[in-house]
Structures are given as C-alpha cells and as structure tokens.
C-alpha cells in the first residue's frame, strides 16, 4: 500500500493518540524570565506537555505562535559531543534518534498527533511554523492541509544556506522549508517593509 493511501489511517490513529494521551506532570515552580510573564521551560514528552498546557494550565486557544523544528526523517542516530574539562577530551553521548522502525508512517503518526495538539493550543489569530527539509516535507504538507485546512496555508518559506557538500548523484541540498499555517483567516501578519533585491543564481 502506498503512503498516500495510508494518510486517512495515519490521521485517525494520530487523533486517537492525541485523545488518549494523558497530561504529563510538570513542575511549574521554576519559571524563566520575569516572574510575571508566565514563561515555562519544560523537559519531557512534548505531546504530554501540550496536553498539560491544554488540560491543566487552561491554555486551549491562547497561544499566538508556535514554531516547531521536528526531526527531519533522516534515518540517523544523533550524538552530542561534550568536552570533559578535567581531561580536555571529547566524548559522544546519545542526543536523539531519527530512525523509525515502521518507516514514514510511524514518523507521520508521531508528528500528526502533535500537530493536532498544536491546533488546539493556537488562538483564533494564531499561526504555526513547521521547520522541515526535503526528506518528508511533502507529506507533512498534506497532513497540515487536512488538520488546518488547505485554505489556511499561508506561505512556504525557503531558507537557503551555503553549508554542506556537493554530490555526483544529485543537486546539492542546500535549503530548508518552513510551512506557515494559520488557524483562521484572522491571523496576524506584519508586512515586510524592506524589498528583496533580485540576485542572480
């Protein structure tokens, strides 16, 4: 079965995962920034945290902007390099894994359940920015169209950069994609004042 044919099941399973997820227990006694701003720094499962915000902190429909930078479906295990002060040696410790036993469908279910939670958190004038790259952004766009509605797609922003090498098998992959969605047509947008100069590629 093709991945496109699995999209309805992925959406259904993600909705069930969101509904069955219990709010995490987070210590809110530590805040970041000015004490009266209500900023929270949290460590834990982000789906459980969003359910905590929705059900415990009563933040449903109160968030104006969400920026999310999920794993890119690279099929790689990532490590962090830490320098040990005593020996001046570098050691590698596991950071996170972007490998998925069930492939694309498992990854899409994981992200889809979280996108559903994000929509619940967004205010009527709220926006969502999803940072991705070439690996799987085309499938995420389909899921976002289903969750937020095709008419609430505002922009695709292409972020180009110069780092990375070249290949003998394909053009260099030197850009990321940001998908910009609104919850409704009431979203806030500040027009760009500075013109973009045309440059030759």
Go through the PLM ranges and name each one:
Residues 1-201:
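Core catalytic lobe of class I
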